[in-house]
Amino acid sequence: MPAGRKWSYPMYNLTGLELKNPTILAAGVLGTTGASLCRVAREGGAGAVVTKSIGPAPKTGHSNPSMIKLDCGFLNAMGLPNPSYPGFLQELEFAKNNSAVPVIASIFGGAPSEFAEVAEGLLPAKPDALELNVSCPHAEGYGAAVGSNPCLVEAVTAAVKDVVNVPVWVKLTPNVADITCIGNAAESGGADAVVAINTVKGMAIDIESGYPVLGNRSGGLSGKAVKPVAVKCVYDLYTALEIPVIGVGGVSSWEDAVELMMAGAAAVQVGSAVYDRVDIFSEIGAGIEAFLERKGYSDIQKIIGLSHEMV
């Protein structure tokens, strides 16, 4: 939104969190420090922010190059680098004390007990919610290695719910035969919402040398190219689940956000597009608001899942 302009609709409730608008920073490099999270909230206008994924032990991630820009988006294989939950507590506390928006901690582990350990270990910093990363496609033993197994997803979700009293979101991988099976497992485990989608498996090769471009060879594709995948996944999950679906994948404009919301997203996360402009959240919020006014919708809830009424 233009400087000084605020979302004029009522505060937006999502799993009990009060958001100033339905846009959220997706987990990624801008969530690495408390200062960067605050910048996105204050300068960018995000309704909430999600941290970089944090695990049980320090992790350096994959060798460079670990991220490249493509015509259609980004390809990355970061490998979940992080300082561990004890090493991140101070950053999370800073974000909580200075961002003025809900702060969601993204966490990962290789087993239910590790997820529970990290979740419980971050509680002193008082995150507003937790997002379980069971969907990263380029970290062996973590992420999608967990998130492609419905039984394990249910167990991980239940283990975290047992040790926290804040909302738990589960971020799903699109790299499965049927994402609704994974969504149902998360819901059965007690998830308060699911987030769809994480990156799509991808690869790039330097044709002059024949070498894969990424240090890890393959990685995850994000950006505009994955939006149709995200729309379909959100649409299917909205039909299959009773809990909210948070849409993410390829959102770079208010039109993209509205499309995901019509597919069933209760809110939208933005990741890759933030690399071009941090104030994209304000732009998207203003665009959604203008769209609602132009179409005569008195409540943003009127467009959530609207496409399901058209068939």
From Swiss-Prot:
Catalytic center residues: 136
Main location: cytoplasm
CDD domains noted in UniProt: DHOD_1B_like
Location of the protein in the cell: Cytoplasm
Cofactor: FMN
PROSITE patterns (UniProt xref): DHODEHASE_2
Name this protein carries in UniProt: Dihydroorotate dehydrogenase B (NAD(+)), catalytic subunit
Species annotation: Methanosarcina acetivorans (strain ATCC 35395 / DSM 2834 / JCM 12185 / C2A)
PANTHER family: DIHYDROOROTATE DEHYDROGENASE (FUMARATE), DIHYDROOROTATE DEHYDROGENASE (QUINONE), MITOCHONDRIAL-RELATED
KW Ligase (keyword) present: no
Assigned EC number: 1.3.1.14
Record Gene3D superfamilies: Aldolase class I
A single Gene Ontology CC term: cytoplasm
Keywords: Cytoplasm, Flavoprotein, FMN, NAD, Oxidoreductase, Pyrimidine biosynthesis
Pathway(s) it belongs to: Pyrimidine metabolism; UMP biosynthesis via de novo pathway; orotate from (S)-dihydroorotate (NAD(+) route): step 1/1
Record GO terms (molecular function): dihydroorotate dehydrogenase (NAD+) activity; dihydroorotate dehydrogenase activity
Function comment: Catalyzes the conversion of dihydroorotate to orotate with NAD(+) as electron acceptor.
GO biological process, one term: 'de novo' pyrimidine nucleobase biosynthetic process
